[in-house]
């Protein structure tokens, strides 16, 4: 029997090439279970990186699909030792089967709490780790909100900045039923909502936003890298992250470390609920008027866009590699693994004053429901080291109130001149990125 990891793919995609390389480095085969994509050809490229693959007939994976795939793959000669899902909609499935297989992971209950933004806020508030007031929005009801406070609306279960916006007018809540219909109809993202389409409204935390890229092993927290969301664009019904920089440029080292310590305290409070293992993309803000840090979201997965390439540039480690390795790490190797993370951590470098590498990456988004006629990014100087165009001529963009990313680009930058670098690259991209619609 060949030792293997089972990768859960959504519609034929899931960082397959990178995870296959990580598995191979551990002398493990990578086998896949995928929901059926609209275009079967999507699987052609995916299968090249898998030792074997099972494809269901439905657009979403369920627990029974995983059970069946495990039996089929066992019959084909694979001993599945762990399950991995980079797609958030399958994160609970991953935990369910890792518990059965004996792989290291957080409990389903802890992950479910993180994925429920309303219950997570209430939990942190009760633990004295948040001061943000929150209300669940009941269908058809108008909440009694303090008119002197800014409020922010978002889905209880969210994805891709779907319908996240500042509530400028209480009448805007009348649009939520139409947005919920979008959520139910969104084939690509529907699985992430896990049949939850309700919304919350919470106090708007005014201040800069950041994300910590974090690995947890047996309750030990390692913040590998921190990104500042240097450019945020607010559209009518969504909030888009246009540029990220690591390390942060707008606040000093001591404040970054204060934020890191706050996140660690929040994770420690959740460890008792079973949040003890995994890779996390933790979004936080510094509430300037109250001089305190606030958790915005705890995403129990790797961050999207170019978070992983950026983290690997800064630390030398891929989050996908570390996540894969941690699932089956022998007890005797835990301390050495944690020592590696401590040595690689950008946060530890900031704590000790050691030099750190720096990156800037940006994302460009499209107009919902439009069709691409032309797209290009060909700067005559200072080209990005990584460039990913996600659409081509003729691509019809989804008519959806979520971020529809057209392009991601990453640059290595000078860590001692971040403000100038971000300002230049912002202008650089605005000048040389071109998209035309039909």
Please state what every model-predicted region is.
Residues 1-109, 329-333, 415-418, 423-438:
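ATP-binding N-terminal substructure of ATP-dependent carboxylate-amine bond-forming enzymes
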Residues 99-168, 178-189:
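A conserved helix-loop-beta module that forms one wall/lid of the active-site cleft
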Residues 126, 143, 324-438:
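Peripheral (often C-terminal) accessory segments that flank ATP-dependent C-N-forming ligase machineries
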Residues 130-132, 170-206, 239-242, 264-273:
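Conserved ATP-binding module of the ATP-grasp superfamily
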Residues 157-159, 204-207, 273-278, 354, ...:
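A short catalytic or substrate-binding loop motif that flags glycine-/basic-rich loops and adjacent residues
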Residues 178-235, 254, 281, 285-294, ...:
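Phosphate-binding site of ATP-dependent enzymes
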Residues 203-206, 210-269, 275, 299-328:
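ATP-dependent carboxylate/phosphate-activation module, predominantly the ATP-grasp catalytic core
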Residues 214, 250, 267-311, 344-346, ...:
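Conserved metal-phosphate-binding beta-hairpin within the catalytic cores
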């Amino acid at each position: 029997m060949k030792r293997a990891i089972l990768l859960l793919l959504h519609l034929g995609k899931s960082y397959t090439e990178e995870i296959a390389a990580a598995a191979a480095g551990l002398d493990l085969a990578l086998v896949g279970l995928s929901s059926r994509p609209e275009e079967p050809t999507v699987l052609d490229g995916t299968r090249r990186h898998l030792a074997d693959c099972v494809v269901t007939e439905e657009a979403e994976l369920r627990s029974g699909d995983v059970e069946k795939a495990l039996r089929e793959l066992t019959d084909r000669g694979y001993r599945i030792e762990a399950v991995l899902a980079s797609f958030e909609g399958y994160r609970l499935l991953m935990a369910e089967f890792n518990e059965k297989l004996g792989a290291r992971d957080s409990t389903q209950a802890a992950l479910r709490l993180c994925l429920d933004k309303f219950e997570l806020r209430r939990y942190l508030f009760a633990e004295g780790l948040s001061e943000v007031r929150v209300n669940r929005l009941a269908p058809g009801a108008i909440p009694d909100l303090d008119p002197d406070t800014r409020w922010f609306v978002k889905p209880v279960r969210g994805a891709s900045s779907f319908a996240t916006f500042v509530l400028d007018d209480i009448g805007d809540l009348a649009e939520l039923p139409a947005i919920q219909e979008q959520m139910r109809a969104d084939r690509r993202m529907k699985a992430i909502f896990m049949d939850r389409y309700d919304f919350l409204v919470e106090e708007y935390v005014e201040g800069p936003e950041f994300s910590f890229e974090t690995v947890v092993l047996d309750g030990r927290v390692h913040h590998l890298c921190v990104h500042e969301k240097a450019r945020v664009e607010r559209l009518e019904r969504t909030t888009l992250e246009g540029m990220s920089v690591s390390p942060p440029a707008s606040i000093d080292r001591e404040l970054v470390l204060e934020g890191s310590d706050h996140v660690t305290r929040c994770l420690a409070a959740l460890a008792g609920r079973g949040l003890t293992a995994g890779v996390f993309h933790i979004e936080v803000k510094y509430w300037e008027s109250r001089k305190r840090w606030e958790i915005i979201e705890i995403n129990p997965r790797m961050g999207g866009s170019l978070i992983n390439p950026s983290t690997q540039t800064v630390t030398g480690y891929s989050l996908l590699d570390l996540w894969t390795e941690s699932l089956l790490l022998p007890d005797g190797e835990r301390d050495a693994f944690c020592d590696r993370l401590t040595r690689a951590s950008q946060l530890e470098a900031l704590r000790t004053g050691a030099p750190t590498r720096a990156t800037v990456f940006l994302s460009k988004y499209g107009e919902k429901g439009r069709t691409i006629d032309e797209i290009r990014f060909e700067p005559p100087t200072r080209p990005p080291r990584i460039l990913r165009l996600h659409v081509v001529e003729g691509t019809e963009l989804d008519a959806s109130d979520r971020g529809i990313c057209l392009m991601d680009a990453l640059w290595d930058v000078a860590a001692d001149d971040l403000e100038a670098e971000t300002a230049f690259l912002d202008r650089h991209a605005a000048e040389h990125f071109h998209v035309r619609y039909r």
